[in-house]
Amino acid sequence: MRIEVNGETAYCYTNSRDIEADKPTVVFIHGSGMDHTVWTLASRHFARHGNNVVSVDLPGHGRSTGNPLATVEEMAAWVIAVLDALAINDAALVGHSLGSLIALECAASHSDRVRAIALVGTTSPMSVSDAILNAAEADDHAAFDMLTQWGFSKRHQFGGNRNSGIWMIGNTLRLYERSAPGVLFHDMRACNEYTSGTDQAAKVACPTLLILGAEDRLTPVRSTRALQEAIPSPLVEVLPGAGHTIMVEAPNAMLDALHQVL
């Protein structure tokens, strides 16, 4: 589905269905340099379980036009504008990595529009190494290489996909490679500069779930302590054997966890 948001075309995957006013809505928000396709399994699953699903391409990503937004706050305002364009009063938000910060900011700043959030592969602050930032700014393929190597657990570096012949890291690498020049850098810089996450987390009033990979090297479980302490009564699921790219590494375990708040 293509809609107009702030004068640009925004693409939202809805499982080829119209938004129905009598159904709850789940919005899926992708991470840095990615697009809606990372949520294909999850969005189809929840569409088949009685929900409207809206899996967005952020501006400048995937099929959405416009330039990448500069800050997490701007991205959160854009997500709310998507809800407005679709005449959705409130929704549950599921975000991965950068998307988790966007979901957090939405819940803190627009509490009347958000009924629950699930933060997948998250932490706050979400610091990005100079090596990745510099490579991304230079549009150096090394940025993609580092993110795919560090973004998966060691066991999944060598396979582990239940679908024979499909390489986890290879698919994610190709997704990064499809992103437009500069997109990854804008996203990673937004993560790095969003320093108010724990303050905003204290304002969250809706049910909140953190889904973490036990072997995540980009947002390690130990780094989430401040976030867990700031959010009022969060649910926390740590998935054994999973790294940062949880949607790919542990899709079924992630779906099971999401049902706690969706």
Region spans (language model):
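Short beta-strand/loop motif that positions the catalytic acidic residue
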Residues: V204, L210-L212, D216
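Conserved alpha/beta-hydrolase catalytic His-Asp/Glu region
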Residues: N134-K203
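Short beta-strand element of the alpha/beta-hydrolase
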Residues: D22-G31
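Active-site glycine-rich loops that stabilize anionic/oxyanionic intermediates
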Residues: G31-M34, S97
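Catalytic histidine-centered segment of alpha/beta-hydrolase-like enzymes
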Residues: A242-L255
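Flexible "cap/lid" loop of the alpha/beta hydrolase fold
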Residues: L101-M146
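Active-site loop/oxyanion-hole signature of alpha/beta-hydrolase fold enzymes
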Residues: G7-N15, T40-R48, N52-L98, D256
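Catalytic histidine neighborhood in serine/cysteine hydrolases
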Residues: V221, R225-H244
